[in-house]
Amino acid sequence: MDVVEVAGSWWAQEREDIIMKYEKGHRAGLPEDKGPKPFRSYNNNVDHLGIVHETELPPLTAREAKQIRREISRKSKWVDMLGDWEKYKSSRKLIDRAYKGMPMNIRGPMWSVLLNIEEMKLKNPGRYQIMKEKGKRSSEHIQRIDRDISGTLRKHMFFRDRYGTKQRELLHILLAYEEYNPEVGYCRDLSHIAALFLLYLPEEDAFWALVQLLASERHSLQGFHSPNGGTVQGLQDQQEHVVATSQPKTMGHQDKKDLCGQCSPLGCLIRILIDGISLGLTLRLWDVYLVEGEQALMPITRIAFKVQQKRLTKTSRCGPWARFCNRFVDTWARDEDTVLKHLRASMKKLTRKQGDLPPPAKPEQGSSASRPVPASRGGKTLCKGDRQAPPGPPARFPRPIWSASPPRAPRSSTPCPGGAVREDTYPVGTQGVPSPALAQGGPQGSWRFLQWNSMPRLPTDLDVEGPWFRHYDFRQSCWVRAISQEDQLAPCWQAEHPAERVRSAFAAPSTDSDQGTPFRARDEQQCAPTSGPCLCGLHLESSQFPPGF
């Protein structure tokens, strides 16, 4: 037998041993895998959430007793909503009650309805069992799954027993999902999410809840776990805009210390929602997230920055986000109703300002292709040959963009000094209407603006190694051409034609006065050796040009 066959047989035997431990049941593993000894009597050691405590719990306080009575009174209202779901599924009353709190004995049926689990089971009869058996035979991550299960919700009475019933169900769900969605496969967060579903749902229902949570457009969690997902980048860009608007000092300090390129709190938001805070607050945040969708993530980020503003402005470059994650957990160490109250207020404020969701994702987001390097904060870059998106509703937060020239149609011919003929052009479909866009027909790479009387002056800080372009590799992909003789004569021609307020391009292609090489050819020669995105032939709209030009 060669090395490959030996390794394959060893791996198959290891997989069978792990599965056998779960099939045998409680305390079937090695001594080091047993973990804490289970409590057989849970009378006075378990709280209302199922968390097992080492010591006997004190009597209920007046506040806790009031909360229990309030939850019982709300149960009938939630039952009425479930009975008439078509009426309440898109109502404001459902959202209001979700922020106030979902009764524990209603949480399972409500999660099932919110994630449309019954419909998924009807469309895929018997598929879960098939995926589970395939996962047992061919899982490549079973060792990681087993290791993560051993540390998932171990203080809860359902998951306290090593290789117990709930841990076995959790193993089956994760193995089945690894086969069901090979793009995501398995990652550590999935064990915590599936465990939360298993607290209130049967095994198969919890599996389809996990499928819907990652696949549905409303929640879009697959972007956090898929290597090709675009959710993270869209939320990251939106977070930078929202925080820069609401907390300019905090974002300014991050820019000054060059902290923006490091880990973002959005990267740990999902972990914070499933681990690190009290189980009661975790469940209430998940209730809101399942009702509201991904737009609930941005208010959570905004609250975190607002609470931690003073600490963040004093944070140095040495491990800022590592300490931020720990302080973010401390932020929620307060009354649950207070946290949800602030979350609701933040949600309303961002919704009013249309900042609860990022702008629509671009086609390149969600693909493995490399993204162009931004020229500045909030600016997006297009490479040569890219086209702008067709006209549609404006983005919620329009940002300056580099764009290609729109198609042109000739308007008239005007004699120019030297016998040349100049054609005044307008964008196609806008004949007779002055446009601030660039007229086509001139040399590729020259920046011309129809509303300007003279050539624009390049800003003094427009340096590929200066603060305007923060990325050092930008100089490999951007080539700024010197102003040609034709551009220098343009103001003289405008002085001779005062009636013509619109800048336009010569019909004949310009050439370099020294070498006689067309600028298009020179652009191709300059861009050929580079590997980054090419910006030759692109222009910036005058209304989007940065201040200081």
UniProtKB/Swiss-Prot annotation:
One of its GO terms (molecular function) is GTPase activator activity. It is a lipid-anchor. Residues 398-417 have a biased composition (Low complexity). The keyword Cytoplasm does not apply. Residues 101-293 form the Rab-GAP TBC domain. Residues 350-443, 507-526 are annotated as: Disordered. This is TBC1 domain family member 3G.
